[in-house]
């Protein structure tokens, strides 16, 4: 988790709510009770220490159920970051994958990850094209970040967009200008055109009204206004793609580097170079045994993704987030 100096200005209750400490404590206790015999041998104090260290480092979401990885903003950010680290090599190789293939990759990390989330991401990349076209890693992951991290926001503005498209007044508390009222009235008399989109000014006012009372995470209103001020009309998926490409929004989430650095991971590259050097100087038998060990680890992950925390912790400590194994096996 990121260190936030403003936490010192919060009350105890505000801090607990903002950091979701009680959620993680409840999950830790639940897992402890479910695997009591195992953790008694492991050591309860050590268990709690490693659980919260895992939460802090962001690798606690590996192989967890979908309801868990989407439960908090930190979990969502951590999952996006792990997905990038695990499969960055796809983008580095320039591979294009279909929607079903990206869905399979996500389910390697989260067995019950819903295909609908991937379909919605593909619609952003392909601008609502239902065809299962091939997508680059960079286009997919930045669009996935918006769809997954801001899921509730995306659903809410979709409803607003559909109301505007059909000429209805969205159920949002806004203070419209005289100009926007005239524009809304005139648009109601016209037939909706999905391709043309809706008036960007009215859409922006509706979104700002939504954000004033929204309880979930949403992109910066400054960034939203910046995007919508540059056009007269906007389509829903065109707007989402603009959010996905906005560097400021990406930095606010904090899960991914900016696009020029997306395929760069110095620590991972150094580890890969070290492994390649070891293979180059090792005898064939040594190489085979090393490959076998990696294969066994991969098989153990896929065979039993719902491992107990203790088992997952051993994997994480061995692989430092499980990313080295993924990248090295792909190379």
From Swiss-Prot:
Subcellular location(s) of the protein: Cytoplasm, Cytoskeleton, Microtubule organizing center, Centrosome, Centriolar satellite; Cytoplasm, Cytoskeleton
Tissues of expression: Expression in elevated in ciliated tissues/organs, including brain, spinal cord, kidney, eyes, ears and lateral line.
InterPro entries recorded: CSTPP1
CDD domains documented for this protein: DD_C11orf49
Chief location bin: cytoplasm
Biased composition range(s): Basic residues: 303-313
Top-rank taxon, per record: Eukaryota
TM spans (from-to): none
Keyword Phosphoprotein: yes
Record note on quaternary structure: Interacts with PCM1. Interacts with the complex TPGC. Binds to alpha-tubulin.
Family note: Belongs to the CSTPP1 family.
Designated name of the protein: Centriolar satellite-associated tubulin polyglutamylase complex regulator 1
């Amino acid at each position: 988790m990121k260190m936030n100096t403003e936490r010192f200005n919060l009350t105890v209750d505000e801090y607990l709510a903002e950091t979701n400490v009680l959620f993680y404590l409840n999950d830790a206790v639940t897992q402890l009770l479910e695997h009591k015999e195992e953790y008694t041998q492991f050591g309860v104090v050590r268990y709690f220490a490693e659980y919260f260290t895992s939460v802090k480092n962001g690798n606690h979401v590996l192989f967890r159920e979908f309801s868990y990885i989407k439960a908090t903003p930190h979990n969502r950010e951590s999952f996006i970051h792990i997905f990038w680290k695990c499969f960055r090599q796809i983008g580095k190789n320039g591979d294009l994958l279909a929607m079903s293939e990206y869905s399979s990759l996500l389910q390697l990390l989260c067995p019950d990850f819903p295909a609908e989330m991937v379909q919605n991401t593909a619609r952003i990349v392909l601008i609502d094209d239902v065809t299962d076209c091939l997508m680059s890693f960079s286009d997919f992951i930045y669009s996935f970040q918006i769809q997954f991290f801001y899921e509730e926001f995306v659903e809410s503005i979709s409803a607003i967009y559909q109301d505007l498209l059909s000429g209805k007044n969205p159920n949002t508390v806004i203070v419209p200008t005289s100009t926007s009222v005239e524009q809304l009235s005139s648009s109601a008399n016209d037939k909706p055109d999905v391709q043309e989109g809706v008036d960007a000014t009215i859409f922006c006012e509706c979104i700002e009204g939504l954000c004033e009372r929204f309880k979930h995470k949403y992109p910066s209103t400054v960034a939203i206004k910046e995007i919508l001020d540059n056009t007269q009309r906007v389509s829903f998926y065109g707007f989402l793609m603009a959010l996905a490409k906005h560097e400021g929004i990406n930095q606010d989430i904090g899960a991914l580097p900016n696009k020029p650095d997306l395929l760069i991971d110095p620590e991972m590259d150094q580890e890969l170079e070290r492994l390649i050097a070891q293979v180059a100087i090792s005898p064939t038998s040594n190489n085979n045994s090393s490959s076998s060990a990696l294969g066994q680890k991969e098989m153990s992950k896929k065979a039993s993704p719902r491992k107990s925390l203790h088992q997952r912790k051993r994997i994480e400590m061995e692989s430092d987030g499980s990313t080295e194994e993924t990248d090295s096996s792909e190379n």
